[in-house]
Amino acid sequence: MNAQNYTQKSLEAIQAAQKLTIENQNQQIEQIHLLAALLRQENGLVPQLLKKMGITLESFEAAVDAELGKLPRVTGSGREADKYYVARAVDTALNSAEDIAKQMKDEYVSVEHLFLSLIENADATLKNLFRPYQITKEACLQALQSVRGNQRVTSDTPEDTYEALAKYGTDLVK
């Protein structure tokens, strides 16, 4: 993973997943940590995508938090502070996100690539989470198209340009 190929929001999400792992006293970063980090990003794209997909955020976040709580904790004198591992499924998802960015002809790996990769390479926990909410790659791509349009990721802060008109414009017809 080359950090220079990731957008600022993507790197923030990865760092937040690491922090969440430490706070929850988990031994390794799992896909659920990365998903939770993507959901909790301030003005994040993933919550926007989920809303466009017709998903109630509060309900989905509660389900994610419940799964986080089920992860084994490592405490006591044998635990080395701030030492954790990256689960193989997370490594696979990060590598896949880079491939997805290339397929979409984007120059940087953005949060949408991370989210799509988590959907595509979901471990058992995420598959069980996504199934009742009908979160699929196709639904996500459709939501992404409505948010992003034909824009490509050509800077390390592309999320700021998505739906700029809706954020900063005024509808004079209303």
Predicted regions and their residues:
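Histone-fold recognition with a strong bias for associated Lys/Arg-rich disordered tails
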Residues: M1-K174
